[in-house]
Structures are given as structure tokens and as C-alpha cells.
A protein has these predicted regions:
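Surface-exposed loop/edge segments in extracytoplasmic proteins
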Residues: 6-11, 43, 180-185
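Edge beta-strands of extracellular beta-sandwich domains
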Residues: 40-54
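Short glycine/proline/serine/threonine-rich loop/turn segments at secondary-structure transition edges
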Residues: 25-31, 151-155
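Aromatic sugar-binding surface patches on proteins
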Residues: 10-20, 194-198
Length: 233
């Protein structure tokens, strides 16, 4: 079997059934072991973690097989039970790296339909201006995640029907990448419905040193729930 070098991460207090440890992974498949005490009995569990490190400077290394997924509008990691892909916490853009441009975090506790990744769609960046990745030339797949949650604040109008529905559908915006328009007037609520998950995928040929995604308000607000960048070749 596999042989692992043990390294203790110390002890942490449990708060609301959660204990947080900082684990400095040094291999691509580390084994995490946890041990505790329950009613006088020692209990333990373990899991082998599969991960690919993402460099801060995306131009500093070869990005073959890069798959960078971001939990937009959230400071939390999220791992999908379906794909097992981990979505990283959001961050502001800095030169040479990646991140959002403009907007504010917003979240909802309303159940999101048409997805098994509800928590991923319950956070967003409202009023977002753009998202940028400073990556080498190549062909990339960009996936954008949307859920119109804004009728939560118009609950009475929404329950009454058409008036609330119309207010949400006013959230319409365009999307461009490196100056080229991909969507003229995208309305997530019109396409998928209120609090319904929607994913959009685009193949981008990047002939510069960056992928600069911009959102252009047509009516209402621009928002983004998640984004994934995958290097194709």
C-alpha cells in the first residue's frame, strides 16, 4: 500500500460541529486523518485528497490541463458532490493573477432549483463590471453560472405574479470577452426562471496575455454566481 509521512496539524476546538485546520499539502494525493473522542471512545476517519495546485501568477507556469473554478461572491471553498471539483473563494483582480472587477457580494438562503450544487448558486457578485484572468495565449473554455435571486426582495410582488416577474426580468445585460460581444441581452430569469440555475459555456481563442470578461448593463443589474476557466490547448 501507499506509505505516508505523518505530520501533525495540532488540535482545534470544535465550533458548531466544525473544526478548521490549515493543511500544507506537499503532494498531489495527501491523506487526511482526523481523530477525536466521543463519549469516552476514540474515533477517527480519513480521506485521500486529490488536488491540483493553482499558482497565484497564472503566466508563471505551464497551464496545460488548467481548470480554475471560482465560487463568485463567496469567501468559501465549495466542492461539488457530483463532479468532485473544488470551487475556490472569490478574490479581487490583481495584475498577473485573476479575479473580479467591481460589484458587491450578495447571497440568499432560497433553494436553487435545477442543480445539485445549490450553495454554489446562492452567492453572487452584484453589480459586477468584469472578471479577468491573466493567462497565456491558447484556446479556453469559459463557463459562467447565473441565478436570478432578486425577487427574494420583492416577495410580495412575486407572489402576486406578473408585477414581480417583470421586475426580475429587467435584469438584462451583455457579455463581452476581450472586446468581442458574446451576449447582447442576456436575461437569466427569462431563460431559466427565478432562482433556477443556469450555465453558459463559451470557447475563447485568446491571442493576448489575458482573458478579460466584461458585463454591460442593459436594464437592472449585472450579476455573476460562478465562473470556470479551462485550458483546452
Amino acid at each position: 500500500g501507499d506509505v505516508y509521512k505523518r505530520q501533525s496539524l495540532g488540535r482545534q476546538q470544535v465550533d458548531n460541529y466544525t473544526a478548521i485546520f490549515k493543511a500544507p499539502f506537499s503532494s498531489k494525493e495527501p491523506l487526511l486523518l482526523v481523530q477525536g473522542n466521543y463519549q469516552g471512545t476514540t474515533v477517527q476517519d480519513g480521506i485521500k485528497v486529490h488536488f491540483t495546485p493553482i499558482p497565484t501568477n497564472l503566466n508563471s507556469t505551464g497551464l496545460k490541463d488548467l481548470e480554475l473554478a471560482v465560487n463568485v461572491g463567496s469567501q468559501c471553498f465549495y466542492t461539488s458532490d457530483e463532479s468532485l471539483l473544488t470551487w475556490l473563494p472569490d478574490q479581487p483582480y490583481t495584475k498577473g493573477s485573476w479575479g473580479y472587477i467591481g460589484g458587491k457580494e450578495l447571497s440568499t438562503q432560497t433553494e436553487i432549483r435545477r442543480t445539485a450544487d445549490g450553495p454554489l448558486f446562492q452567492t453572487l457578485r452584484n453589480g459586477i463590471e468584469g472578471y479577468r484572468f491573466d493567462v497565456p495565449r491558447g484556446v479556453y473554455e469559459v463557463e459562467l453560472l447565473f441565478t436570478d435571486i432578486f425577487l427574494q426582495n420583492e416577495g410580495i410582488a412575486y407572489q402576486l405574479g406578473r408585477e414581480g416577474e417583470q421586475k426580475s426580468r429587467e435584469n438584462t445585460f451583455g457579455i463581452s470577452v476581450n472586446g468581442k460581444m458574446l451576449e447582447e441581452k442576456l436575461s437569466p430569469c427569462k431563460e431559466s426562471g427565478y432562482c433556477q440555475a443556469m450555465r453558459k459555456k463559451y470557447i475563447i481563442t485568446n491571442d493576448t496575455d489575458h482573458i478579460d470578461i466584461r458585463f454591460h448593463p442593459a436594464s437592472g443589474t449585472c450579476f455573476l454566481n460562478g465562473i470556470k476557466l479551462r485550458n483546452i490547448h
